[in-house]
């Protein structure tokens, strides 16, 4: 059975699965132009098969506990993704990534999903340190981190190559002890 985290009456997180390939590919295509302003990977999504391979890899990583990828559903419609892009089990640390369909932004959906995800894994004792890295010139993502109790720990200079330039990246973290 697919892991599900209930966020609210209308929002749920579903662990990535094979049946998400087609709607995920369609959502990426719909949002590709603006996604490429902040993320490098959308340029490499050329077909549904590319998405299938990514999903299959993430299913395996999810099962092994080295990453967790969740689809964000609003009333049974796929509207975005939130994930632990990398998990360090020994350190109980997870690096978080997220993106949302452009038409659903500005409604607090990512914040709600983020809170539900980190609390679910903090309460289980699996994770305690949560990290968000975002480009300095991505104000929306920086605001998500700050609004959700993450503390700016520093700025990584020229840490991310995107659109023919090296960009500075802010590193935010939040620690939640389950005790």
UniProtKB/Swiss-Prot annotation:
- Gene disruption: observed consequences: No longer acetylates bL12.
Q: Mind naming one GO cellular-component term on file for this protein?
A: cytoplasm
Catalysed transformations (reactions): N-terminal L-seryl-[ribosomal protein bL12] + acetyl-CoA = N-terminal N(alpha)-acetyl-L-seryl-[ribosomal protein bL12] + CoA + H(+)
- Localized where? Cytoplasm
Family annotation (Pfam families): Acetyltransf_3
Q: List each copy of the N-acetyltransferase domain by range.
A: 11-172
- Check the UniProt entry and state the signal peptide residues, or none: none
List the PROSITE patterns hit by this protein, alphabetically: GNAT (PS51186)
Q: What SUPFAM superfamilies has UniProt attached to this entry?
A: Acyl-CoA N-acyltransferases (Nat)
Q: Name one GO molecular function term.
A: protein-N-terminal amino-acid acetyltransferase activity
Q: Name one GO biological process term.
A: protein modification process
UniProt superkingdom: Bacteria
EC numbers listed for it are 2.3.1.-
The protein's UniProt keywords, in alphabetical order, are: Acyltransferase, Cytoplasm, Transferase
Q: Which NCBIfam families match?
A: PRK10151.1
**Assigned protein family:** Belongs to the acetyltransferase family. RimL subfamily.
Annotated function: This enzyme acetylates the N-terminal serine of ribosomal protein bL12, converting it into the acetylated form of bL12 known as bL7.
**What protein name is recorded for this chain?**
Ribosomal-protein-serine acetyltransferase
The organism is Escherichia coli (strain K12)
């Amino acid at each position: 059975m697919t892991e599900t985290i209930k966020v609210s009456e209308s929002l749920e997180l579903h662990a990535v699965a094979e049946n998400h390939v087609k709607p995920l590919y369609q959502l990426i295509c719909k949002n590709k132009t603006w996604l490429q302003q902040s993320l490098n990977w959308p340029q490499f999504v050329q077909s549904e098969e590319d998405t299938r391979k990514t999903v299959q890899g993430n299913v395996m990583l999810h099962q092994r506990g080295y990453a967790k990828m969740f689809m964000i559903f609003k009333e049974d419609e796929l509207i975005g993704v939130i994930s632990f892009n990398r998990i360090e089990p020994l350190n109980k640390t997870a690096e978080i990534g997220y993106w949302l369909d452009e038409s659903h932004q500005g409604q607090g959906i990512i914040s709600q999903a983020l809170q539900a995800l980190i609390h679910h894994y903090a309460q289980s004792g699996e994770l305690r340190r949560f990290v968000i890295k975002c480009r300095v010139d991505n104000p929306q993502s920086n605001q998500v981190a700050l609004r959700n109790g993450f503390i700016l720990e520093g700025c990584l200079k020229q840490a991310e190559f995107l659109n023919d330039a090296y960009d500075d990246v802010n590193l935010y973290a939040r620690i939640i002890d389950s005790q």
